[in-house]
UniProtKB/Swiss-Prot annotation:
Family membership noted in the UniProt record: Belongs to the PsaE family.
Chief place of localization: membrane
Record membrane topology: Peripheral membrane protein
GO cellular component: photosystem I reaction center; plasma membrane-derived thylakoid membrane
The name this protein goes by in its record: Photosystem I reaction center subunit IV
Record keywords: Membrane, Photosynthesis, Photosystem I, Thylakoid
Keyword Membrane applies: yes
Lineage, uppermost ranks: Bacteria, Bacillati, Cyanobacteriota, Cyanophyceae, Synechococcales
Gene3D superfamilies: 2.30.30.50
Length: 69
């Protein structure tokens, strides 16, 4: 399962805010780190600063936690 930059992927990490959501791979690190895929999503998570709109729309995942959409 070779995931590369620009691929649309579905998140399979159950504890993730974006579980079963589809995102676009922003980058893939090949240096051997565990969570080597940066995935960008359309919606933001709940981690915005109090009183402001917004939050994070990217997260790192291992390739084993993703499947191509």
């Amino acid at each position: 399962m070779a995931i590369s930059r620009g691929d649309l992927v579905r998140v399979k990490r159950p504890e993730s805010y974006w579980y079963n959501e589809i995102g676009k791979v922003a980058s893939v690190d090949t240096t051997g780190i565990k969570y080597n895929c940066v995935v960008r999503f359309e919606k933001v998570n709940y981690a915005g600063i109090s009183g402001t709109e917004g939050g994070a729309n990217t997260n790192n995942f291992a390739e084993s936690e993703l499947e191509k959409a």
